[in-house]
Amino acid sequence: MALLKSDDKKMKKILKVSIGPLMLITILYGCSGNSAERHNSGSSGFLDCPDTPNCVSSLAKNPKHQVEPFRLKKDPKTSWDVVQKTVGSLPRTKLVLADNSDIHAECRSLIFRFVDDLTLHLTPANGIINIRSASRTGYSDLGVNRRRVENLRKKLRHKDIIE
């Protein structure tokens, strides 16, 4: 009986030693991602959302990924400056690109620091801002991207920038 307990302890130790590095490698691999593969802003539009439930877009073809675009209430130039500042103020968000018509931001999750891409494109002629928020890795985001877009919508409405 003592031999079995000793073998059990050895097996548990082996499992702990092997699973730890494996999990670390998995997390690091999951965090590495090429945003260029997932982000396509500019007048050509956005990449469509994948079939996985971790992306929302105002230009999504699949209704389950759709969100309404933002409709500006005021002058596009002035409003766009406020939009840029508001996006930059979101928690754990880093502006990667902010120009006259495009914003690309990287949003990190609180615990595992996974990166999501938040992309906005302004069409000044009609005052429409198309928006896309997508996880770089994983299958489901548990609604994080949709909540991010709706939180941004709420902040911009509070500032009387969008309808």
Give short role names for the model-derived ranges.
Residues 7-29:
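Sec-dependent bacterial lipoprotein signal peptides
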Residues 31-163:
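Ser/Thr-rich, low-complexity intrinsically disordered terminal regions
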